[in-house]
From Swiss-Prot:
Lineage of the species this protein comes from: Bacteria, Pseudomonadati, Pseudomonadota, Alphaproteobacteria, Sphingomonadales
Record text on subunit structure and interactions: Homodimer.
Gene Ontology CC, one term: cytosol
Enzyme class, UniProt record, top EC level: transferase
Pfam families: tRNA_m1G_MT (PF01746)
Superkingdom, taxonomy of origin: Bacteria
Protein name in the entry: tRNA (guanine-N(1)-)-methyltransferase
Biological source species: Novosphingobium aromaticivorans (strain ATCC 700278 / DSM 12444 / CCUG 56034 / CIP 105152 / NBRC 16084 / F199)
Length: 246
């Protein structure tokens, strides 16, 4: 099955952009995924191709019109039924690896890119649009965020990455940051590769990597660490209840 990536944007020339090279580009050429960049302006309702208007209540900037957005979304949904519609916006829920994996396991995704002051609020409930943020930052538009979302999905598609285990050992896949990596030379400016990684003892290497993941997560992302600990406690409690029920 080909993963269908549809982007609704005022700048379709930005796609596939960096997704046309490297692993994603090869996967695109091989048909693992397909790219359709749709010009929102094509769905304008006047001869001037107007897609925005002034904010109700006053204020700076312009807001993308709900009627234009709705027509663009309806067009994309008709072409790709079953694909969720995601709007890239700093007001959205933080994008997680778990959500990325859910999307990658599906038929595709329709990504709505904003510009100006953003979207008319009514589009989200009116067309069941999921709001997603890639970080606590504000970009000039949603296109760069859309590229991030699509790249995260594409690399998880079957056959895109070389090693089957690659996607499962990375940061966030098990709720932790990924362990540190090293390669030759063994010594550089007095800094050496940890001895355990040169030992050939796979059990010790696995234990070291797990320990480093936990240490780095605890120090660098205490929010992830607290979530990880909470999940472990919940899992242990559930297992204990099952034993007691038996």
């Amino acid at each position: 099955m080909t993963f269908a990536a549809t982007v609704l944007t005022l700048y379709p020339e930005m796609f596939p952009g960096p997704l046309g090279v490297s692993l994603a580009g090869r996967a695109l050429r091989e048909g693992a995924w397909a790219m359709d960049a749709v010009q929102i302006r094509d769905f304008a309702i006047d001869k001037h191709k107007t897609v925005d208007d002034t904010p109700a209540g006053g204020g700076a900037g312009m807001v993308l019109r709900v009627d234009v957005l709705a027509k663009a979304i309806d067009h994309a949904r008709e072409a790709h039924p079953g694909c969720p519609v995601i709007a890239m916006t700093p007001r959205g829920k933080p994008l997680t690896q778990e959500r990325v994996r859910q999307l990658a396991d599906g038929p595709g995704v329709i990504v709505l890119c904003g510009r100006f002051e953003g979207f008319d609020e009514r589009i989200f409930a009116g067309r069941e649009v999921e709001e997603v943020s890639v970080g606590d930052i504000v970009l000039s538009g949603g296109e760069c965020a859309a590229l991030m979302l699509l790249d995260a999905c594409i690399r998880l598609l079957p056959g895109v990455m070389g090693a089957a285990s690659s996607g499962h050992e990375e940061s966030f896949e098990n709720g932790l940051l990924e362990y540190p990596h090293y390669t030759r030379p063994a010594e550089w400016e007095g800094r050496t590769i940890p001895e355990v990684l040169r030992s050939g003892d796979h059990a010790k290497i696995a234990a070291w990597r797990k320990s480093q993941s936990e240490i780095d997560t605890r120090l660098r992302r205490p929010d992830l660490w607290e979530r990880h600990i909470g999940a472990r406690v919940q899992s242990a409690s559930g297992a204990q209840r099952e034993v007691q029920d038996d």
